[in-house]
C-alpha cells in the first residue's frame, strides 16, 4: 500500500503557512514547502517566509536550500521533495506539502518527461513578461541560460523562444541535454489528498495590498538592497525575478518612484494570485475551502482525519 501525503494548495496571501502549522499541531504530519521563492536564502520578507520561531516549532523542508545565485527547477524540486517525503514516511509520519507553486505540484504529482508538456501557468507568465519587456528580452535570457539554443532561434520567434524557456524552467536542463534522452515521466508513489484554498477574490486583493504594505514596513527594500550589494546577483536570475523582488530591483535602479513601485508590486502579486487561482480551478481533484471563513481549520481537519483514518487523528 502506498503511503499517504496531503497537498495544501492556494494562491499567495491566503494564510497557507498558518493553517499548515495549525494542522501540524493536530496530526502526525511534517511540512514540505512548495514555493519557488522560499527555496532561496535571503528572500525572507518579500517571499513571506515563515519567521525563525515558526520554523523552529514547525520545520519546513525545502526552505533556504539554495543561494539566490543558483538555479532551481521543477525537476530539482521533484527530486528534493521526493527525498523529503520518503524521509518523513520512514519516520511513520505524513508529508503535508504546502504552497502555491502549481508548476512544482504538477511536476511532483505527474513527473517530468525529458521534454515536458506545455504548462499553461508558466506559458501565461512568459507571455506576460514578453508583453511587458518584448520577445528579444526573453531571447536574451535564453542566450544566458542556453547559448546553443539561442543561436538557433531568432529573437522575435516567439513560439520557439517561449518553448525553449518553458523546457529549461520545467526540467532544469538545456535543450541539447533534453534532446539526448527522453525518459518517461514517473508518477508520484503516494496516495494524495488535495486541499485547495480559494477565497473571495475581492478579499484576497485587499489582503495582498495590506500584506505588501506590511512587508515595506518590515524592511523589504532594505532586504533587496542587501541582495544587490552582494555584487554577484543580476536582475535576470530566477530568484530576482520573483514577484516583488523584480519590482524592488527596478525601483532601486531608478526605473520608477516609490509610489509606482508599490503599485506595480501589488499589481504583479494580484496577477500571480489570479494565475494560481486559475490553475487550482482547472480540473484538479481537490476539495475546496475558503480560508477566510470561520471554521476553515476545523473543516480542513475533518478532511485530513477522514483521509488518514482514526488511528492518526
Language-model features, listed with the residues they occupy:
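Phosphate/pyrophosphate-binding catalytic cores of soluble transferases and nucleic-acid-acting enzymes
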Residues: 1-313
Amino acid at each position: 500500500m502506498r503511503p499517504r501525503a496531503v497537498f495544501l494548495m492556494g494562491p499567495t496571501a491566503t494564510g497557507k503557512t498558518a493553517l499548515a502549522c495549525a494542522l501540524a499541531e493536530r496530526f502526525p504530519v511534517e511540512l514540505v514547502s512548495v514555493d519557488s521563492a522560499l527555496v532561496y536564502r535571503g528572500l525572507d520578507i518579500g517571499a513571506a517566509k515563515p519567521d525563525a520561531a515558526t520554523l523552529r516549532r514547525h520545520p519546513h523542508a525545502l526552505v533556504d536550500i539554495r543561494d539566490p545565485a543558483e538555479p532551481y527547477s521543477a525537476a530539482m524540486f521533484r527530486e528534493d521533495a521526493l527525498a523529503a517525503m520518503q524521509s518523513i514516511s520512514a519516520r511513520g509520519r505524513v508529508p503535508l506539502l504546502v504552497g502555491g507553486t502549481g508548476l512544482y505540484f504538477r511536476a511532483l504529482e505527474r513527473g517530468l518527461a525529458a521534454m515536458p508538456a506545455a504548462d499553461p501557468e508558466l506559458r501565461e507568465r512568459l507571455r506576460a513578461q514578453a508583453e511587458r519587456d518584448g520577445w528579444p528580452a526573453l531571447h536574451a535570457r535564453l542566450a544566458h541560460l542556453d547559448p546553443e539554443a539561442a543561436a538557433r532561434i531568432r529573437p522575435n520567434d516567439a513560439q520557439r523562444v517561449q518553448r525553449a524557456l518553458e523546457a529549461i524552467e520545467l526540467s532544469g536542463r538545456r535543450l541539447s541535454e533534453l534532446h539526448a534522452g527522453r525518459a518517461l515521466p514517473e508518477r508520484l508513489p503516494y496516495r494524495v489528498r488535495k486541499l485547495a484554498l480559494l477565497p473571495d477574490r475581492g478579499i484576497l486583493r485587499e489582503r495582498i495590498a495590506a500584506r505588501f504594505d506590511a512587508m515595506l514596513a518590515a524592511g523589504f527594500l532594505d532586504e533587496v538592497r542587501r541582495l544587490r550589494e552582494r555584487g554577484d546577483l543580476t536582475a535576470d536570475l530566477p530568484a530576482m525575478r520573483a514577484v516583488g523582488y523584480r519590482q524592488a530591483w527596478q525601483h532601486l535602479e531608478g526605473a520608477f518612484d516609490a509610489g509606482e513601485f508599490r503599485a506595480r508590486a501589488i499589481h504583479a502579486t494580484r496577477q500571480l494570485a489570479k494565475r494560481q487561482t486559475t490553475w487550482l480551478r482547472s480540473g484538479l481533484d481537490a476539495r475546496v475551502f475558503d480560508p477566510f471563513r470561520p471554521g476553515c481549520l476545523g473543516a480542513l481537519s475533518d478532511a485530513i482525519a477522514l483521509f488518514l483514518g482514526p488511528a492518526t487523528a
